[in-house]
């Protein structure tokens, strides 16, 4: 628990202190965000707001993770784990893709950065590296960071995938989650606030898995997760980094996280879902992100097949703005929906444990 608190604390401090530095530097360099002309017109006043704030989020995550381990090692705790490093590496690789995308947008003064093919290739390569490595690094208990079995709140024994299919599954997960968070990042503080709650929920999930790990507490309801405590540290560092960034990103935003932040944070959800054996539970915890990407898919599918749109604009947070909702109203209500989804996800997680104990 000490390491979890330290990770969150360091991440908050680094993120909240580094972000204003980035605001000043990026403002001097003219690294401002371009705004879509077809979006809500009141968004045009945001043109020129510094972007690439995801750099501060990633810095907070790295500092929180390794800072907590430096303290932990001093008290005799284990160092970084394969699971934690893989999730952090996935987030960083995706953040790198996002950084290139953001930089091109800024240099060319347009709302489009990398072309779709280049961006997709970057995401796929990041996912492939993660998918292959997550089945390596077997520990003394025979556990690898990931499992080829599909999982809900623990592995589903009847649904096992060959290694190649599992890697493809990881690609789909990473692509889906990174794009889902990217689509959600369209209003001030929306994605950051939702991510803080989802990763906060993952702190609870992973700490519970640690307290009921099969390696230390064998039983019918124990969890076969390789490094649950270290994954809790990763989740706490991510939540802390998002909270620190949110101080400056809340409406009216002084800086945007950009694709640097949104792709990286989507990678965190994908990575945690695989390494904690909760791929299906993640859909509940991150239901708001799922709804955002589904709204985009529905909009495209409906327009291409019928010539009509389901929403006035997608992602659907803009739909509510065009209906007349104030931006802050949309943000707060979506935060509330995320809090409800996280509460439901945690209830399902704990309920499954109680049901297993009862059996």
From Swiss-Prot:
- Spell out the reaction equation it catalyses: UDP-N-acetyl-alpha-D-muramoyl-L-alanyl-gamma-D-glutamyl-meso-2,6-diaminopimeloyl-D-alanyl-D-alanine + di-trans,octa-cis-undecaprenyl phosphate = di-trans,octa-cis-undecaprenyl diphospho-N-acetyl-alpha-D-muramoyl-L-alanyl-D-glutamyl-meso-2,6-diaminopimeloyl-D-alanyl-D-alanine + UMP
Question: In which compartments does the protein localize?
Answer: Cell membrane
What cofactors does the UniProt entry give for this protein? Mg(2+)
An example Gene Ontology biological process: cell wall organization
GO terms of molecular function:
metal ion binding; phospho-N-acetylmuramoyl-pentapeptide-transferase activity; UDP-N-acetylmuramoyl-L-alanyl-D-glutamyl-meso-2,6-diaminopimelyl-D-alanyl-D-alanine:undecaprenyl-phosphate transferase activity
Q: Which UniProt keywords apply?
A: Cell cycle, Cell division, Cell membrane, Cell shape, Cell wall biogenesis/degradation, Magnesium, Membrane, Metal-binding, Peptidoglycan synthesis, Transferase, Transmembrane, Transmembrane helix
Recorded hits in InterPro entries, A to Z, give:
Glycosyl_transferase_4 (IPR000715), PNAcMuramoyl-5peptid_Trfase (IPR003524), PNAcMuramoyl-5peptid_Trfase_CS (IPR018480)
Q: Name one GO cellular component term.
A: plasma membrane
One Pfam family here? MraY_sig1
User: What is the name of this protein?
Assistant: Phospho-N-acetylmuramoyl-pentapeptide-transferase
The gene is mraY
């Amino acid at each position: 628990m000490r390491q979890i608190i330290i990770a969150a604390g360091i991440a908050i401090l680094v993120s909240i202190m580094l972000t204003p530095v980035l605001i000043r530097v990026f403002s001097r360099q003219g690294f401002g965000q371009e705004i879509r002309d077809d979006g809500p017109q009141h968004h045009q006043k945001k043109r020129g707001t510094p972007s690439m704030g995801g750099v501060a989020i990633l810095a907070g995550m790295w500092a929180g993770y390794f800072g907590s381990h430096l303290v932990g090692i001093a008290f005799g705790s284990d160092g970084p784990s394969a699971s934690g490093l893989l999730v952090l590496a996935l987030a960083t690789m995706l953040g790198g893709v996002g950084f290139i995308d953001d930089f091109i947008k800024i240099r060319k003064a347009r709302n489009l950065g990398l072309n779709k093919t280049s961006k997709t290739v970057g995401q796929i390569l990041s996912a492939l590296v993660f998918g292959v490595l997550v089945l390596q690094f077997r520990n003394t208990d025979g556990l690898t960071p990931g499992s080829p079995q599909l999982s809900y709140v623990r592995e589903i024994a009847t649904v096992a995938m060959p290694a190649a299919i599992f890697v493809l599954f990881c690609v789909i997960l990473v692509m889906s989650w990174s794009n889902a968070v990217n689509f959600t990042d369209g209003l001030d503080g929306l994605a950051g606030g939702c991510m803080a709650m989802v990763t906060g929920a993952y702190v609870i999930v992973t700490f519970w898995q640690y307290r009921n790990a099969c390696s230390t507490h064998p039983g019918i309801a124990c969890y076969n997760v390789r490094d649950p405590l270290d994954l809790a540290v990763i989740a706490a560092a991510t939540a802390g980094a998002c909270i620190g960034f949110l101080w400056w990103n809340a409406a009216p935003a002084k800086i945007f996280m950009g694709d640097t932040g949104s792709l990286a944070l989507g990678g965190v959800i994908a990575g945690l879902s695989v390494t904690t054996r909760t791929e299906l539970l993640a859909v509940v915890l991150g239901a708001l992100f799922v709804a955002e990407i589904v709204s985009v898919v529905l909009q495209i599918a409906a327009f291409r097949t019928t010539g009509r749109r389901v929403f006035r604009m997608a992602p659907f947070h803009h739909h509510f703005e065009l209906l007349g909702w104030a931006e802050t109203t949309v943000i707060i209500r979506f935060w509330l929906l995320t809090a409800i989804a996280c509460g439901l996800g945690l209830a399902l997680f704990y309920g499954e444990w109680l049901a297993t104990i009862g059996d």
